[in-house]
């Protein structure tokens, strides 16, 4: 919604201000200039990136428009799963715990947290490190180094589309100049025409420069910033898992270990301690009541 509102404000102010100055919108209607700039930008983007990054960019744009970031329910589900696993680590046998992490789809713990189970990467991350804790030989600082390395890799992969779009956006003003030069070349072919005809052709050529700068700083730039924000918030779930499990490995009881994870959540989205306690007593209760 923020993206739609921002686009409406941007177009409304720019076009409204232009018309208020006495400008004519038909002069800005240069579809072939837009084709040159858009085609060159997208073509360069495809050349510079693998198809995985291209596809992930489309996915990231969809996530940005839908603002697909973790909500309170997802944070509570993640904390609830971690609490249940840590509690079982203290009270149940290795075989019982392995039954949950070997087949999370059939696990009552993960089934009570559908938002976690839907996130295959996060589920695998949790299961992998709980398995390492079960083994019992790894020290907490070794697990921490391993977690940091994996989170860094996940972040690097998720940010590839951000860096790719940033590069494309930075190139658009220069591509706009290319479109403008092509327009000037065309205008020079009509140098013997009447001044008003030549002026119209030069004005059309200058639209290329305008479009390049406008697309770069008013469209692509803000979209890229939104993508970065969304992906960073999605990665926060991994940090929650890391801090919670490390606190448990360092001797904290499950209730206290959850606080280490909860405190890593931004204050704007952080669930209250009462909500976390309720989740510990009734895992997945929020989603069940929501479904009811």
UniProtKB/Swiss-Prot annotation:
It is a multi-pass membrane protein. It comes from the Bacteria. Keywords: Cell inner membrane, Cell membrane, Chemotaxis, Flagellar rotation, Hydrogen ion transport, Ion transport, Membrane, Transmembrane, Transmembrane helix, Transport. Pfam families: MotA_ExbB (PF01618), MotA_N (PF20560). The keyword Transmembrane applies. GO terms for cellular component: plasma membrane. Its main location: membrane. The keyword DNA repair does not apply. Coiled coil: none annotated. One of its GO terms (biological process) is chemotaxis. It is found in: Cell inner membrane. The chain crosses the membrane at residues 3-23, 27-47, 171-191, 204-224. Belongs to the MotA family. Each stator complex is composed of 4 MotA and 2 MotB subunits. 2 A subunits and 1 B subunit are thought to form a single ion channel, so that each stator complex contains two channels. MotA and MotB comprise the stator element of the flagellar motor complex. Required for rotation of the flagellar motor. Probable transmembrane proton channel. PANTHER family: CHEMOTAXIS PROTEIN MOTA (PTHR30433), MOTILITY PROTEIN A (PTHR30433:SF4). This is Motility protein A. The lineage of its organism: Bacteria, Pseudomonadati, Pseudomonadota, Alphaproteobacteria, Hyphomicrobiales. The gene is motA.
């Amino acid at each position: 919604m923020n993206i739609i509102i921002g686009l409406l404000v941007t177009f409304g102010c720019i076009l409204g201000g232009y018309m208020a100055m006495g400008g004519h919108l038909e002069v800005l209607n240069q579809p072939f200039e837009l084709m040159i700039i858009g085609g060159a930008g997208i073509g360069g983007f495809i050349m510079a990136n693998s198809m995985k990054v291209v596809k992930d960019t489309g996915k990231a744009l969809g996530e940005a428009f839908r603002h697909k970031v973790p909500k309170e329910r997802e944070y509570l589900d993640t904390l609830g799963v971690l609490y249940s696993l840590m509690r079982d680590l203290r009270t149940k046998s290795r075989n019982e715990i392995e039954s949950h992490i070997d087949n999370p789809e059939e696990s009552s713990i993960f089934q009570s947290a559908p938002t976690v189970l839907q996130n295959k990467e996060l589920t695998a991350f949790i299961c992998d490190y709980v398995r390492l804790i079960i083994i019992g030989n790894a020290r907490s600082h070794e697990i921490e180094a391993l977690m940091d390395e994996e989170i860094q890799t996940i972040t690097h992969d998720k940010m590839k589309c951000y860096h790719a779009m940033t590069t494309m956006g930075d190139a658009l003003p220069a591509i706009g100049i290319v479109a403008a030069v092509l327009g000037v070349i065309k205008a020079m072919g009509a140098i013997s025409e009447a001044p008003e005809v030549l002026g119209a052709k030069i004005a059309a050529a200058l639209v290329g420069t305008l479009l390049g700068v406008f697309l770069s700083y008013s469209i692509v730039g803000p979209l890229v910033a939104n993508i970065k924000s969304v992906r960073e918030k999605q990665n926060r779930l991994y940090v929650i898992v890391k801090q919670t499990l490390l606190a448990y490995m360092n001797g904290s009881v499950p209730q206290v270990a959850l606080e280490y994870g909860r405190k890593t959540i931004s204050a704007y989205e952080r669930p209250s301690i009462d909500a976390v306690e309720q989740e510990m007593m009734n895992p997945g209760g929020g989603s069940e009541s929501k479904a009811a």
